[in-house]
Amino acid sequence: GMARLNRPSIFVYGGTILPGENHTDIVSVFEAVGSYVAGDIPITQLEHIEKTAIPGAGSCGGMYTANTLASAIEALGMSMPNSSAQNAVSDNKKQDCIDAGKAIVYLLEHDIKPSDIKTKKAFENAITLIITLGGSTNAVLHLIAMADTIGVEVTLDDFVRIGEKTPVIADLRPSGKYLMSELIEIGGIQPLM
């Protein structure tokens, strides 16, 4: 939407969910359902996991589509620094909203549009970050579509080229061990950029 309109704009991400009891998340619920169906846990345990794994507001706690794309948008330069790595329910997220308000005033005053920010190099930075984070493969479709909308050529070949020289260094769920909230604790994505 921002690229199609090409008006000064900034993305404000809602933030990630805090972990549930005993380091649980949405995947814990899926696994518990499977365990219950297999007869490995009683219904009371399944219900307890369902009630405690998702403690409040925010996107899924791992490097799923929402956190992946929020990180990519930050790397593109379309959101505030470190805004993709904030818990939904936090003072940092409130401050991010205030900072975004100040930033949009600057963008409007200087007529800085998405087409000025979303360059080929910006998309390459976003792709590099997503690969480093082990982000969702949905980023491929979304970033190609975003680039096309703004008139920048990004193809699957760009992902392959960048991926061949970029290691995955984050160990984030769903395939890894850690949650986004733990990446936040060590500084978010800024140290990676």
Each model region followed by its residue ranges:
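Phosphate/diphosphate-binding loops
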Residues: G1, E47-K51, D158-M193
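Active-site cavity-forming subdomains of large catalytic enzyme subunits
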Residues: G1-N125, L129-I130, G135, L143
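Phosphate-handling active-site elements
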Residues: P8-F11, I150-D158
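Acidic, glycine-rich active-site loops and adjacent beta-strand->loop/helix elements
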Residues: Y13-P19, A53, M146-D148, V160-I169
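Acidic/polar loop patches that form or flank catalytic/metal-binding clefts of enzymes
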Residues: P81-S83, E153-D157, P191
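Short acidic alpha-helix initiation/capping motifs at coil-to-helix transition points
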Residues: G135-L141, L172-P174
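Alpha-helical support elements that line or immediately flank enzyme active sites
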Residues: L141-V152
